[in-house]
């Protein structure tokens, strides 16, 4: 019996690996937690809140986007990020499927 719902897409093995690698970095995890604490989070605010250079923040945002964990929206000259909850849910479900015995 599948526990996946219509709003919870399956991740390909490559997507699962990208998410796992993205979440393994403590700085990316901290950035993701900050973004998740608000509906949207401005890139400029991330640069103020975290003791990281703009280039480092940009690199980590690109990795999180490549993994599908966040999406961006440009408003004028400002970039805003938000969590893609459906990807986190799919990753969590796949992780449970892989590591927890269900019988």
Language-model features: where?
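Amphipathic alpha-helical dimerization/coiled-coil segments
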Residues: 1-16, 33-37, 84-103
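N-terminal helix-turn-helix DNA-binding core of bacterial DNA-binding proteins
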Residues: 14-53, 75-87
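Extended rod-forming repeat segments used as scaffolds/tethers
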Residues: 32, 66-67
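Alpha-helical residues within the helix-turn-helix
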Residues: 48, 65-66
């Amino acid at each position: 019996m599948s526990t996946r719902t219509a709003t919870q897409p399956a991740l390909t093995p490559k997507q699962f690996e990208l998410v796992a690698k993205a979440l393994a970095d403590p700085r990316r995890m901290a950035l993701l937690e900050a973004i998740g604490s608000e509906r949207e989070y401005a890139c400029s605010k991330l640069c103020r809140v975290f003791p990281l250079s703009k280039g480092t923040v940009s690199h980590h945002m690109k990795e999180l986007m490549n993994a599908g964990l966040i999406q961006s929206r440009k408003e004028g000259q400002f970039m805003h990020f938000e969590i893609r909850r459906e990807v986190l849910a799919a990753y969590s479900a796949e992780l449970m499927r892989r590591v927890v015995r269900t019988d």
